[in-house]
């Protein structure tokens, strides 16, 4: 009788007349106005592969532990495979009344295979289920971003090889500072993105522990084998505390932070592309494929896509802050606020995948205007530091040398010329330490070649650095290749 009573009231009528899976305790359905408001299905349906993988692993473990029969486990696995294939093919209709991806799949499974589908949720709560789905999703998203990161770094390294003899002004405060190799400049970004790869891997690792078995918050009385489930899903281990398992979203914050730093690096690079492609700089010419025009000004060729990448950094930062603010006041354990944790992560990952791809395309198709860069090296007194070093190496304290050269620069400003344009007699009047070989200190290629310290811009130093960058890239590709048993994101729910 109790069994029949449970079956009779297992479902609860929802606002649309259909049934909710959690309805045994309720006498009335949800208000119609809350149906869409409370549903997460439009977002978490994108985790359908993760949800199905988690359910298959859970059912397999239940059968291994003798909690459900082998026949039920087989029916569940086959039913879930059929649902996944239908979603992949775009032949599955998601119903907002199912509330979330878990109920959507479970209700369809029960419709297809009957009684066995109702046993799937034994020993499991949606709390540990959604935490598992989300962790699997973060691993998949981090892996996708790591791959895009590697592709962009290949483009940067290839460009650094190509432009290893091109010199341009280096800037501080957006003022001419010292000359550097373009390859040196590009490798600076390569190292930034290399650090981003490390942060993405850290986010992957933070998500790489399984919450299944924590149930609602306190664990379960069923003899679950959590290690088996974790291994089936490719997790490194299990989360040791059931409260933490269902309420932790630090791993999502790690993904958001890694993504925010990537966005910041992309934005900085985009800003330079915008500047360099302007008429005032003319250092690069963007491909037509990565530019747009004006609806009124026929002459315009705008770096819209670099500007968009720069602009999208704010969007990515916003997603990080949104989750931080959501989490800051939540008591243990699960709270419905956590339903707001996935949309931002999916948006950040999608946004950055586009940005990384577009950036790689822009750099690989741009034209570097070496003449414009060389011409700009002839203004702004880029040799000033080396002239001061010239005096310091001949015994004059550097601070005094700094003052002498500062006076020479002021003289140039008043005359409207550059340091190399001053007659030798002017140098000798400024300091008797100047000799005819001062011309070497004024030669831009010689200045660059002299920067031989480790990490410097001299061609020899950059060649060493380039080798290190390639070695780091190869090592990170090995790390990427080791990321096995990741449940990849599905695209059938788009």
Where are these regions (language model features)?
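Short amphipathic alpha-helical segments with heptad-repeat character
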Residues: 135, 139-146, 150, 157, ...
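A helix-coil-helix interface module used to build multimeric assemblies
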Residues: 15-219, 224-231, 292-293, 304, ...
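Acidic, glycine-rich loop-and-beta core segments that form the ion-binding/anion-interacting portion
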Residues: 234-325
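Glycine-rich cofactor/substrate-binding loops
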Residues: 18-54, 115-116, 297-494
């Amino acid at each position: 009788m109790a069994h029949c009573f449970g079956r009779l009231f297992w479902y609860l009528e929802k606002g649309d007349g259909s049934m909710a899976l959690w309805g045994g305790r309720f006498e009335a359905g949800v208000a119609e106005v809350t149906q869409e408001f409370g549903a997460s299905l439009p977002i978490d349906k994108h985790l359908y592969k993760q949800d199905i993988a988690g359910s298959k692993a859970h059912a397999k473990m239940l059968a291994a532990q003798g909690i459900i029969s082998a026949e039920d486990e087989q029916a569940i696995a086959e039913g879930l495979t059929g649902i996944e294939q239908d979603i992949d093919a775009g032949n599955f209709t998601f119903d907002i009344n199912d509330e979330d991806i878990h109920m959507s799949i479970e209700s369809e499974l029960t419709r297809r295979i009957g009684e066995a589908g109702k046993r799937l949720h034994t020993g499991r709560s949606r709390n540990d289920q959604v935490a598992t789905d989300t962790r699997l999703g973060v691993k998949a998203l981090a892996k996708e971003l790591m791959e895009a990161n590697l592709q962009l770094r290949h483009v940067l390294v290839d460009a650094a090889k190509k432009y290893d003899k091109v010199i341009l002004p280096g800037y501080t405060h957006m003022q001419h500072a010292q000359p550097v190799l373009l390859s040196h400049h590009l490798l600076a970004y390569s190292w930034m993105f290399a650090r981003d790869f490390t942060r993405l891997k850290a986010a992957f690792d933070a998500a790489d522990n399984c919450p299944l078995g924590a149930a609602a918050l306190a664990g379960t009385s069923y003899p679950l084998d959590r290690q088996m489930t974790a291994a089936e899903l490719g997790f490194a281990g299990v989360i040791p505390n059931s409260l933490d398992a269902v309420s932790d979203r630090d791993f999502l914050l790690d993904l958001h932070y890694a993504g925010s730093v990537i966005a910041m690096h992309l934005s900085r690079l985009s800003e330079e592309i915008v500047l360099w492609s302007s008429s005032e700089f003319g250092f690069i010419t963007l491909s037509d494929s990565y530019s747009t025009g004006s609806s009124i000004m026929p002459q315009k060729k705008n770096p819209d896509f670099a500007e968009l990448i720069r602009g999208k950094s704010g969007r990515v930062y916003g997603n990080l802050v949104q989750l931080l603010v959501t989490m800051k006041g939540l008591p243990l354990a699960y709270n419905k606020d956590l339903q707001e944790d996935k949309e931002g992560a999916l948006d950040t990952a999608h946004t950055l995948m586009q940005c990384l791809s577009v950036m790689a395309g822009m750099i690989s198709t741009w034209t570097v205007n070496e003449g414009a860069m060389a011409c700009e090296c002839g203004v702004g007194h880029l040799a000033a530091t080396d002239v001061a070093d010239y005096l310091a190496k001949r015994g004059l304290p550097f601070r005094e040398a700094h003052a002498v050269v500062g006076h020479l620069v002021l003289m140039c400003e008043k005359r409207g010329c550059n340091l190399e344009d001053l007659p030798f007699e002017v140098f000798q009047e400024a300091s008797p330490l100047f000799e005819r070989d001062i011309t070497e200190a004024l030669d831009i290629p010689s200045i660059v070649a002299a920067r031989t310290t480790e990490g410097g811009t001299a061609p020899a130093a950059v060649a060493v650095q380039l080798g290190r960058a390639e070695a780091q890239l190869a090592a990170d590709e090995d790390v990427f290749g080791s990321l096995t048993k990741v449940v990849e994101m599905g695209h059938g729910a788009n």
